[in-house]
Regions:
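A structural "hinge/loop" feature
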Residues: 87-107, 127-128, 154, 176, ...
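N-terminal lobe/hinge region of extracytoplasmic solute-binding protein
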Residues: 3, 86-135, 166, 248-252
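Extracytoplasmic/peripheral linker and loop segments enriched in polar/acidic and small residues
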Residues: 34-38, 366, 444-461, 470, ...
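Append "and occasionally in soluble cytosolic enzymes with long acidic Gly/Pro-rich linkers
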Residues: 348-436, 440, 525, 572
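Ligand/substrate-recognition segments at binding pockets and active sites
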Residues: 407-474, 516
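Surface-exposed binding/hinge segments that line
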Residues: 143, 160, 169, 173-235
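Extracellular/periplasmic solute-recognition and catalytic clefts
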Residues: 259-269, 285-344
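Gly/Pro-rich hinge or "lid" segments in bacterial periplasmic/extracellular proteins
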Residues: 194, 209, 215-279, 283, ...
Length: 573
């Protein structure tokens, strides 16, 4: 999922994964066990998601001083049974239409998926009680829990799952994240336009509690993939049109319903028909904006219980006697990368891409970032992701090689090269440094501009610039979410339109491999192909921070940036 840079007073953050609760099921979902460190979700993206450099942050553990006194008590944020969270503004609350983390925060509370990911990155049952993968990985069978209901008490059945997933492939307006299940039979044909009938998708419901998914390959990954918000279940009344906010009237499948909505605050109410039981926190106030106020000041005043914060605030809060104990570092599976438009223009020539990549000192750019904000990337798959390929796949800085490659492509000293457009999402000094290095090392003048998030998404989808930047956060725990999903031929998230048969074969081998060592070897090969062909250049892995009210349990994160409200509970409640 795309993620934006977090700057300014409304910026957000994230925490470390605590031990998984003893119970493999409802204890994690609705009844927190023990008292893991409370924490917020990776909210820097919770403000809606794409664009330039990740501004999330993390403080190295040994720099954190021991608590000097207990953190601020919960004062005015709410009464018992209520939690107030800074969540940002969603661009969509429709599972089939959203494309950013900020929206996923809302979608995930209103609509439930078949599976979910716990703080230890384990796949847990949600609407599905169990699942089976065939020996060859080409069929996955999910068995739903009995007697599931939507928030209005109507039955939730397997046919609703089929209906919800088919909506991802609505002709003319497919989900931006539909490629996540590109290995399901019929999905690629629907995405390429070879088919316009969503009923050809390989998903069926032979009875009310069974969902059968036929795969081309990679069935072993499907239970993890469908934990992501796009695969949440919507009611039968949801047609092809986008689901819009309807306070008091929405039928949901998740832990909460939308009770009210204003320009500043959305209020969520616990769903008594939720499969894991009515959530312990009955009311959640989701703040869309602080209207210019500082999240630290608002938290200190008791106006919020969970808020993301900027890395600059995290640096001094670690030593603050009052707020320091409430500071949490959230796990963050995210990467910031720069990309090239490879379908047309000069960057369709691999030599031009290689020249530009070699003319920029990527490692120096990453090293100049504040370590509380990000760490240098070694490849597209972020640190902490299970199965991350080992090695350094970032292009080496070599000006002589860059000049030679550009000359071979027919542009000696940049002569004859058409105007290069570079649109960022607020990369600031890093973007400026890239423009300066290209001028100094290749003699190339780059036209640079920034755009707001919505306009930027539209531009990438309709008329991509020559160079662009994005941050991507994991949809599920798996390397393919950063390789095949972002760079596979025909993927809806492949912004630069790159296509490479050897890369596609490598990620297909990795996603279908039953042996972890074989999967690692295949994904390592895929990373090397990216490094050689340079459709994108990974720069940094983001880090995140939040403040969490003392006594709030169950707010641990899993690295995908979603705070599971159903698992929250006040100590002693």
């Amino acid at each position: 999922m795309v993620e934006p840079e977090l700057t300014g007073p409304d910026a957000p953050a994230t925490p470390p994964a605590p031990p998984s609760p003893a119970s493999p099921d409802a204890a994690w979902w609705g009844q927190p066990t023990g008292a893991p460190p409370a924490s917020g979700s990776r909210w820097r993206r919770a403000l809606v998601a794409v664009v330039a450099l990740v501004a999330a942050v993390a403080l190295v553990a040994h720099l954190l001083p021991p608590p000097l006194e207990s953190g601020p008590d919960r004062t005015s944020a709410a009464s018992a049974g209520t939690v107030t969270v800074l969540a940002g503004s969603p661009t969509s609350i429709d599972p089939a239409r959203h494309n950013d983390l900020g929206s996923a925060q809302y979608v995930s509370q209103l609509y439930e998926t078949l599976t979910a990911v716990d703080p230890g990155l384990n796949i847990r049952p949600a609407l599905a009680a169990s699942w089976q993968v065939s020996g060859n990985g080409t069929r996955v069978t999910f068995t739903l829990r009995p007697n599931l209901e939507f928030s209005d008490g109507s039955p939730l059945t397997a046919s609703d799952v089929v209906h919800s997933w088919r909506r991802l492939f609505t002709p003319g307006s497919p989900s931006p994240l539909a490629s996540l299940i590109g290995d399901v039979e019929g999905a690629r044909e629907l995405l390429s336009g070879q088919s316009t009938d969503p009923s050809t998708l390989g998903v069926s419901a032979p009875d009310a509690t069974t969902v059968v998914v036929d795969m081309v390959q990679g069935g072993g990954n499907l239970p993890a993939i469908v934990s992501s918000a796009p695969f949440a279940v919507v009611p039968p009344s949801a047609g092809d049109a986008e689901i819009m906010p309807a306070p008091g009237a929405m039928v949901t499948s998740g832990a909460y319903t939308l009770a009210s909505a204003s320009a500043d605050t959305w209020t969520l109410q616990a769903n008594p028909h939720y499969w894991a039981g009515t959530p312990a926190v009955g009311t959640v106030k989701m703040l869309l904006t602080l209207n210019g106020q500082s999240p630290v000041d608002e938290f200190s005043a008791g106006a919020m219980d969970v808020t993301p914060i900027s890395f600059t605030d995290a640096g001094w809060l670690a030593y603050d006697r009052q707020l320091g104990p409430s500071l949490r570092e959230d796990p963050s599976l995210s990467v910031t990368y720069y990309g090239f438009e490879t379908r047309t223009g000069p960057f369709a020539d691999v030599r031009v891409r290689q020249a530009f990549a070699a003319a920029i000192d990527w490692r120096r750019l990453a090293a100049l970032e504040d370590p509380l904000n990000s760490v240098p990337a070694t490849g597209m798959v972020p640190a902490g992701m299970p199965g991350q390929p080992t090695g350094d796949f970032v292009p080496a800085f070599d000006v002589a090689k860059a000049k030679s490659l550009l000359a071979q492509a027919g542009y000696p000293d940049g002569q004859g090269l058409p105007t290069i457009t570079f649109i960022g999402g607020g990369g600031g000094d890093s973007d400026a440094a890239i423009v300066a290095m290209l001028k100094a090392n290749l003699g190339v003048t780059v036209q640079y501009q920034t755009m707001d998030f919505n306009a930027y998404q539209q531009r990438l989808a309709t008329n991509p610039p020559d160079i662009w930047s994005l941050s991507w956060v994991a949809d599920y725990p798996g390397p393919n979410d950063f390789l095949g999903v972002l760079l596979g031929s025909g993927s809806t998230a492949n912004q630069g339109g790159w296509s490479n048969a050897a890369f596609d074969a490598a990620v297909a081998q990795g996603s279908s491999a039953a042996d972890p060592a074989a999967a690692l070897a295949a994904y390592t090969q895929a990373e090397q192909i990216v490094a050689d062909q340079v459709p994108v250049v990974p720069v940094s892995y983001g880090r995140s921070w939040s403040l969490v009210r003392a006594g709030l349990l169950g707010a641990a994160q899993n690295g995908t940036g979603i705070l599971r409200l159903a698992g929250l509970q006040w100590s002693g409640q």
